[in-house]
Amino acid sequence: MQNFGKVAVLMGGFSSEREISLDSGTAILNALKSKGIDAYAFDPKETPLSELKAQGFQTAFNILHGTYGEDGAVQGALELLGIPYTGSGVAASAIGMDKYRCKLIWQALGLPVPEFAVLHDDTDFDAVEEKLGLPMFVKPAAEGSSVGVVKVKGKGRLKSVYEELKHLQGEIIAERFIGGGEYSCPVLNGKGLPGIHIIPATEFYDYEAKYNRNDTIYQCPSEDLTEAEESLMRELAVRGAQAIGAESCVRVDFLKDTDGKLYLLEINTLPGMTSHSLVPKSAAVTGVGFADLCIEILKTAHVG
């Protein structure tokens, strides 16, 4: 096996997704140790990143979610320290964390995305409701794990929802509702893995459904995707990742409308690795267990 030296599993951090990161990090740490890797937990909230060099770490497995963890900040710090790290680089991480600018790039390249609008204090909210229709989704551009996602159903409600959310990270986006199914497709080392059909018990795949409930259904392989649709989803996931320069292991989320058209929703450049997480479920279908998946991701560690 490749010699990775002393490995820091970067977990925890400062964002609203801290607890999820700790869960993922603990699972990864245990998996790496089970494979004989000299791995240790490292929480930047408790210990400055500058200590990585002082403590003799040679590789970083980054599973920091949210602000500072997957927005290019920690990636830049690791570049300066010269420590190879997993996940995407600085630019791709920053773009992937910004749903608005990621959508602009996908749209410019002809990839299918739901119609959307950016909201500001002086937005004509009635016009946005008329353009996108109801219901619609409203979300902050730079939060993950469905933090702050609201389904707006009632006419005249858009402005008040915007006021509730505008303190969150990044622009606030209104997005056309796509009334079909929810899916996700991981990409590992530039190769699309089996798509997952997500059937939440809640109204949509929100934070509660992702992390706190056991009745969300994950179908992998999906029972309602044709072979052609599955192939297209993988192709679109790979193209979506390549469009922003994302690498290592990412996950692209999709919606499928009632006519069967697929839409790219967003990309996660550092997908979760908890017991509820989607990437391990997809990899398992291909015969890759959790510990082996962690090793495959660790092999992608890079600088530059």
Curated annotation (Swiss-Prot):
Q: Which reaction does it catalyse?
A: 2 D-alanine + ATP = D-alanyl-D-alanine + ADP + phosphate + H(+)
Q: Where in the cell is it found?
A: Cytoplasm
What pathway does the annotation place this protein in?
Answer: Cell wall biogenesis; peptidoglycan biosynthesis
Question: Which GO biological process annotations does it have?
Answer: cell wall organization; peptidoglycan biosynthetic process; regulation of cell shape
Q: What is its EC number?
A: 6.3.2.4
Q: Which Gene3D superfamilies match?
A: 3.40.50.20, ATP-grasp fold, A domain, ATP-grasp fold, B domain
Q: Which residues form the ATP-grasp domain?
A: 103-299
Among the Pfam families in the record, one is Dala_Dala_lig_C
- Kindly state which keywords UniProt assigns to this record, in alphabetical order: ATP-binding, Cell shape, Cell wall biogenesis/degradation, Cytoplasm, Ligase, Magnesium, Manganese, Metal-binding, Nucleotide-binding, Peptidoglycan synthesis
Drop me one GO molecular function for this one: D-alanine-D-alanine ligase activity
Binding, Mg(2+) 1: 253, 266
Residue positions annotated to bind ATP are 129-184
Query: SUPFAM superfamilies under this entry?
Result: Glutathione synthetase ATP-binding domain-like (SSF56059), PreATP-grasp domain (SSF52440)
**Cofactor note as given:** Binds 2 magnesium or manganese ions per subunit.
The protein's superkingdom reads: Bacteria
Q: Which cofactor does it need?
A: Mg(2+); Mn(2+)
Q: Where does Mg(2+) 2 bind?
A: 266, 268
Instruction: Please provide, in alphabetical order, the Gene Ontology terms of the cellular component aspect for this entry.
Output: cytoplasm
Question: Mind telling me which InterPro entries this protein's record contains?
Answer: ATP-grasp (IPR011761), ATP_grasp_subdomain_1 (IPR013815), D-Ala_lig_Van_CS (IPR000291), D_ala_D_ala (IPR005905), Dala_Dala_lig_C (IPR011095), Dala_Dala_lig_N (IPR011127), PreATP-grasp_dom_sf (IPR016185)
Q: Which NCBIfam families match?
A: D_ala_D_alaTIGR, PRK01372.1
The record describes the protein's role as: Cell wall formation.
Q: What is this protein identified as?
A: D-alanine--D-alanine ligase
Write the gene name.
ddl
